[in-house]
Amino acid sequence: MNIAVVGLSHKTAPVEIREKLSIPEAKIESALTHLKGYPHIQEVAIISTCNRLEIYAVVTDTEKGVVEITQFLAEIGHIPLNVLRRYLFTLLHQDAVRHLLRVSAGLESLVLGEGQILAQVKNTHKLAQKYNTISQLLDRLFKQAMTAGKRVRTETSIGTGAVSISSAAVELAHAKVTDLSSKKIAIIGAGKMSRLLVTHLLAKGSQQIAIINRSQRRAQELAREFPHLPLQLYGLEEMMTTVAASDIVFTSTGATEPILTKTLLTEVTITANSLMLIDISVPRNVHTDVKELAQVQAFNVDDLKAVVAANQESRRQMAREAEALLEQEVEAFELWWRSLDTVPTISCLRSKIEDIREQELEKALSRLGTEFAEKHQEVIEAMTRGIVNKILHEPMVQLRAQQDIEARKRCLQSLQMLFNLSVGEEYS
């Protein structure tokens, strides 16, 4: 068996490809079930964010398992395989392990060190557990990744002052118009990203902010987090009139199709000399045809790279500190994985000794007579179990701790020969 990851990210694919392969949480269950149904995939988990889609799998045949995942991606994205392969990356075993730990630590993010990805990794693990598509290997790997992500944030300074997608979007707007305090701003969406947008806009002095959202309850919840700011709340039926009256519009919704198009914008009268649309959603909320309108400037997540780059150089030394720490976590996972080849032998030996214990206990109790056996069986049972456990404990600890692969293999072979054990090789 092997661990593989097949995916694409902001580093390998533009937003127009990423949005085709984005899997919303509502469709994760069916995607996981579909993947688990392939003959060479034993465990599977999916990370799907605006900047990456990565499928982690335990495969019984590496080449065939990778082909199955690639075929799945081509099908859901309706992208020909020969086109899709240009944008995909595939990593195996230790490289796949290291990659997930780097993702969890924010080292693979568009915004180096950003913290939101750790929560997304946790959610990936939770969903895979919920839908029963991970078992021993991926469960341990994701737990190791979450530990690594937490350690990087507590033991290094990489998360300090990190920009986020939301803050980068506000910085982009600020760079284009300089004075945000005088601008009318609309935010379409009322989720976490929208809340962060409001926070960063307030820091830039913005006061005229409107929230447009399908659910008024969620919009009101967001507004309650900013009691000193008179946020204006609108439903989707007022979206276009609110957009037309704004100078800058941020979009951050879970819509799978564009909600702002050239056609919709031409149907309203734009009051500003120039309307700036900044779309931080994947799939995109703003259609590319809006750029054909003279009054409109449109940007998406890929346009944030220049803003982020200015923040990156000062963080590279911090990233090197984090990488050293991550190597410790990679090694910890590798040691655990290598120790799995001892499990079948240990289980087989324990089972054989337990059979002997039960047989000898039954003989002893029959000799002691019914009355004595009934009165003292529990004590005798506990004593014999204790003897077995104490005899096995030290050899088992030493066997698991043996880091030299060849030395451990010789120990296992000796045990199998001396005790006449028939052992499969489930994890080797």
Curated annotation (Swiss-Prot):
SUPFAM superfamilies: Glutamyl tRNA-reductase catalytic, N-terminal domain, Glutamyl tRNA-reductase dimerization domain, NAD(P)-binding Rossmann-fold domains. Pathway: Porphyrin-containing compound metabolism; protoporphyrin-IX biosynthesis; 5-aminolevulinate from L-glutamyl-tRNA(Glu): step 1/2; Porphyrin-containing compound metabolism; chlorophyll biosynthesis. It catalyses: (S)-4-amino-5-oxopentanoate + tRNA(Glu) + NADP(+) = L-glutamyl-tRNA(Glu) + NADPH + H(+). NADP(+) binds at residues 189-194. Possesses an unusual extended V-shaped dimeric structure with each monomer consisting of three distinct domains arranged along a curved 'spinal' alpha-helix. The N-terminal catalytic domain specifically recognizes the glutamate moiety of the substrate. The second domain is the NADPH-binding domain, and the third C-terminal domain is responsible for dimerization. NCBIfam families: hemA, PRK00045.1-3. This is Glutamyl-tRNA reductase. The gene is hemA.
